């Protein structure tokens, strides 16, 4: 799910300079529309084709959320007057241009999420759940401080799942990691921390996620996602998968919501960064992550990636080998395997020469995090993802299909830095093959982790906030445009029709005020190609 963006910088790139700025941007539940809040109103855009379908002048808007493509919109202001207070939520009918209801809360509203059955309003320390058909309040949940406004609601009413951060807790407490329960007011989980323990202690786990059934209004489980504090969470549209990232920004994990089992783990990069947004494709074949590096990474949820993540039992000899190897890493400073010092987060050369003294501690924390959850995962029957003929290569090994399919490389992104990283990853794979039999499988996966299937570079300033979504297949008209920007492999006999079926929209909205539309090759992966871009900073009163 996407997150609200802060006020944009005054720099607008190639766009026409205006006095307008963006307070908020998000995709709707099926990624067919974008809602944008400005200093003087809000707009709603259709993404395919990209057109403005609604523009309303108003006060400064901090949140504008859609209910799919219906006329119902939830609006929260950013003004100082009572009518535009950030504590007031207005549910608006855009077709009738009328307010359905107004709700006032004790503190500022940080997020609003909706599906066809529920509306969820998040304050810093409270969650309110409403029946969206009657706007009657059904339930309240008291939570620990959540200033980042992290919350996710599935768009499906079949699996009406709500996810939000759990309070910190001691990692050595003997609790079932995915069977946490709470009482009606959901306060019992706040007792995880003894009174004499400082909540800011480095010994506490801050990255757990509570799974809540919004239909039955009952908590389901607590998923131990990360040791560090959460930075982003997202639920798949059908409510079956949960994606998480911590404030380190190096690891993205995907869990089965029903069982709490970790299905996938991906390494975004080695250097810490801020992950702004996680988002699943509608068919759960991909999950994408946008970050402060201006790079969006797309990870494939296939069988090969699952096999490289699944826990397995290991012998005492492997345990001892792991301990010896960890000790040798502490003693030999600066002698890390090549694959542990590369970074896929940004193709810029300066990232390769950045100080990386913190890598050892982060790697050790990743290992400890993996070993801590082994006690639970090894006792579960892990569900296997079933191969699908509609996956276009997502499930199963590429080599098993025939010759290995090389990823698409954008000539505009070729650089010495990227060549060094590719060489480093190749050396890492060879090291993993030789050392794998002697290491715990979790540590072996750190030597040769799942990495991104595809990526794209957003033409934006560093630390520009972005939200991202994966849409439908690219149309034939856009393929003609795509052909103007890239050279098609002469050895490929793929027809335009087949090529069309292989490409998906990857859409990015930046806080600088741009909408970017990229093409993702679902079979080859690699670099996504920029198809089009549009400015969102035209006069908000022009519609």
From Swiss-Prot:
It holds the Pfam family PROPPIN. A motif (L/FRRG motif) lies at residues 266-270. It is found in: Preautophagosomal structure membrane; Vacuole membrane; Endosome membrane. GO terms for cellular component: endosome membrane; phagophore assembly site membrane; vacuolar membrane. Coiled coil: none annotated. It comes from the Eukaryota. Residues 343-372 have a biased composition (Acidic residues). Residues 173-183, 326-336, 377-400 have a biased composition (Polar residues). Residues 163-200, 326-408 are annotated as: Disordered. WD repeats lie at residues 225-265, 270-309. It is a peripheral membrane protein. GO terms for biological process: autophagy; protein transport. Component of the PI(3,5)P2 regulatory complex. The N-terminus might form a beta-propeller domain involved in specific binding to phosphatidylinositol 3,5-bisphosphate (PIP2), leading to the association of the protein to the membrane. The L/FRRG motif is essential for the cytoplasm to vacuole transport (Cvt) pathway, for the recruitment of ATG8 and ATG16 to the PAS in nutrient-rich medium, and for its recruitment to and dissociation from the PAS under starvation conditions. The PI(3,5)P2 regulatory complex regulates both the synthesis and turnover of phosphatidylinositol 3,5-bisphosphate (PtdIns(3,5)P2). Necessary for proper vacuole morphology. Plays an important role in osmotically-induced vacuole fragmentation. Involved in correct ATG9 trafficking to the pre-autophagosomal structure. Might also be involved in premeiotic DNA replication. Required for cytoplasm to vacuole transport (Cvt) vesicle formation, autophagy, glucose-induced micropexophagy and ethanol-induced macropexophagy. Required for the involution of the vacuole that occurs during micropexophagy. This is Autophagy-related protein 18. It comes from Komagataella pastoris (Yeast).
């Amino acid at each position: 799910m996407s997150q609200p963006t802060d006020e944009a910088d005054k720099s607008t790139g190639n766009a026409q300079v205006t006095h307008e700025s963006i307070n908020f941007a998000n995709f709707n539940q099926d990624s067919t529309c974008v809602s944008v809040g400005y200093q003087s109103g809000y707009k709603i855009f259709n993404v395919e084709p990209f057109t403005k379908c609604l523009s309303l002048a108003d006060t400064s808007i901090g949140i504008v959320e859609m209910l799919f493509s219906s006329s119902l919109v939830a609006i929260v202001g950013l003004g100082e007057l009572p009518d535009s207070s950030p504590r007031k939520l207005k549910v608006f009918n855009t077709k009738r241009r009328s307010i359905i209801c107004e709700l006032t809360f004790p503190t500022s509203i940080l997020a609003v999420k909706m599906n066809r059955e529920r509306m969820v309003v998040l304050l810093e320390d409270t969650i309110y759940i409403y029946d969206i058909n009657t706007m009657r309040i059904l339930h309240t949940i008291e939570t620990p401080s959540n200033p980042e406004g992290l919350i996710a609601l599935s768009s499906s009413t079949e699996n009406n799942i709500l996810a939000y951060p759990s309070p910190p807790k001691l990692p050595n407490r003997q609790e079932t990691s995915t069977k946490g329960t709470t009482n009606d007011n959901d306060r019992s989980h706040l007792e995880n921390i003894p009174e004499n323990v400082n909540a800011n202690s480095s010994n506490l786990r801050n990255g757990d996620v509570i799974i809540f059934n919004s239909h039955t209004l009952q908590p389901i489980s607590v998923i131990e996602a990360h040791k560090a504090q959460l930075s982003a969470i997202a639920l798949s549209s059908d409510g079956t998968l949960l994606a998480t990232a911590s404030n380190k920004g190096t690891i993205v994990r995907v869990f089965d919501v029903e069982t709490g089992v970790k299905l996938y783990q991906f390494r975004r990069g080695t250097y810490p960064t801020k992950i702004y947004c996680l988002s699943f494709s509608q068919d759960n074949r991909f999950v994408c992550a946008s970050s402060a590096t201006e790079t969006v990474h797309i990870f494939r949820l296939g069988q090969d990636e699952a096999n490289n993540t699944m826990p397995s039992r290991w012998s005492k000899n492997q345990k001892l080998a792991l301990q010896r190897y960890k000790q040798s890493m502490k003693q030999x400073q600066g002698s890390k395997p090549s694959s542990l010092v590369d970074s896929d987060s940004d193709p810029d050369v300066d990232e390769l020469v950045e100080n990386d003294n913190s890598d050892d501690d982060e790697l050790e924390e990743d290992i400890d995090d993996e070993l801590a959850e082994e006690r639970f995962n090894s006792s579960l029957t892990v569900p296997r993802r079933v191969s699908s003929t509609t996956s276009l290569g997502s499930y199963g090994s590429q080599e098993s299909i025939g010759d290995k399919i090389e990823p698409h490389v954008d000539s505009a992104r070729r650089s010495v830095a990227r060549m060094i990283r590719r060489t480093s990853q190749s050396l890492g794979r060879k090291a993993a093959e030789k050392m794998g039999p002697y290491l715990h499988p979790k540590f072996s996966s750190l030597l040769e982790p799942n990495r991104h299937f595809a990526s794209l570079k957003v033409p934006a300033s560093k630390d520009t906030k972005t939200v991202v979504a994966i849409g439908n297949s690219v149309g034939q008209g856009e393929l003609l445009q795509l052909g103007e920007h890239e050279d098609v492999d002469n050895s490929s006999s793929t027809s335009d029709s087949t090529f069309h079926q292989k490409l998906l929209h990857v859409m990015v909205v930046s806080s600088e005020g741009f909408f970017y539309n990229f093409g993702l090759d679902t079979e080859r992966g690699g670099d996504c190609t920029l198809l089009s871009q549009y400015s969102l900073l035209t006069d908000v009163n022009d519609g």
